[in-house]
């Protein structure tokens, strides 16, 4: 059953998240990624949202492999207020920000990802430092900050669009997974056929 959360719960969760970030920075003195989801409305955790979050973590791991990075620390937290993941990395903060923005901008699902990169001194790395545009609105594609501050779109519209994005991403992933399993099955059957001794009549 999906649980709704209050503003007080969200504020408490934000405070705990900041405290966790500060503890990691104090312990490692290295940049970190704080990954959460941009989910509008009172429901912040559901099987569909968790699927989207898991995909985001998978994409981050792929980027780590490409960059030959192994996180010094990786923490994952699941609360009624939403999923959170923290990655401490021994790398240049701007380099990290570049691949997180690549993930955020690559697909519709990425627009629901909030991958903050935090320097050892606690300052966030801004997109502007990489000469990148700000985040775009889910619905109209305009500047997200403008639409949010002016409340251009209703909560219902944002929730509907969010569900659409999460559902499409889940379905696409299921199709891709099924295709990979089919290829593996065919390969397995072909190997069995090749390994079978030839019978002569």
Residue ranges and their predicted role:
Residues 18-20, 70-72, 98:
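Hydrophobic alpha-helical segments with strong N-terminal bias
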Residues 1-61, 104-174, 182-188:
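Long, contiguous binding/interaction regions
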Residues 192-201:
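Single conserved hydrophobic/aromatic residue that forms the stacking wall/gate
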Residues 70-71, 172-176:
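Flexible, glycine/charged-enriched surface loops at secondary-structure junctions
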Residues 41, 63-74, 82-84:
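Non-transmembrane, aqueous-exposed alpha-helical and coiled segments at domain scale
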Residues 75-126:
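A broadly conserved sequence feature marking short terminus-proximal activation segments
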Residues 25-36, 70-78, 195:
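Short, compositionally biased low-complexity segments
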């Amino acid at each position: 059953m999906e649980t709704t959360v209050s503003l007080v719960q969200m504020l408490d969760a934000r405070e705990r998240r900041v405290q966790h970030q500060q503890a990691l920075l104090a312990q490692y003195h290295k940049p970190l990624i704080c990954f959460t989801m941009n989910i509008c409305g009172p429901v912040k955790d559901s099987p569909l949202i968790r699927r989207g979050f898991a995909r985001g973590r998978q994409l981050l791991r792929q980027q780590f492999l490409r960059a030959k990075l192994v996180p010094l620390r990786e923490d994952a937290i699941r609360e009624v207020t939403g999923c959170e993941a923290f990655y401490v990395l021994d790398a240049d903060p701007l380099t990290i920000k570049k691949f997180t923005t690549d993930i955020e901008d690559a697909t519709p699902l990425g627009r629901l990802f909030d991958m903050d990169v935090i320097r050892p001194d606690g300052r966030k790395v801004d997109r502007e430092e990489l000469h990148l545009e700000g985040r775009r609105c889910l619905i109209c594609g305009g500047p997200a900050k403008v639409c949010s501050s002016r409340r251009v779109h209703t909560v219902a519209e944002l929730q509907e669009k969010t569900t659409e994005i999460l559902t499409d991403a889940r379905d696409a992933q299921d199709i891709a997974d099924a295709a990979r399993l089919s290829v593996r099955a065919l390969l397995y059957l072909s190997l069995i056929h090749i390994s079978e001794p030839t019978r002569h009549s």
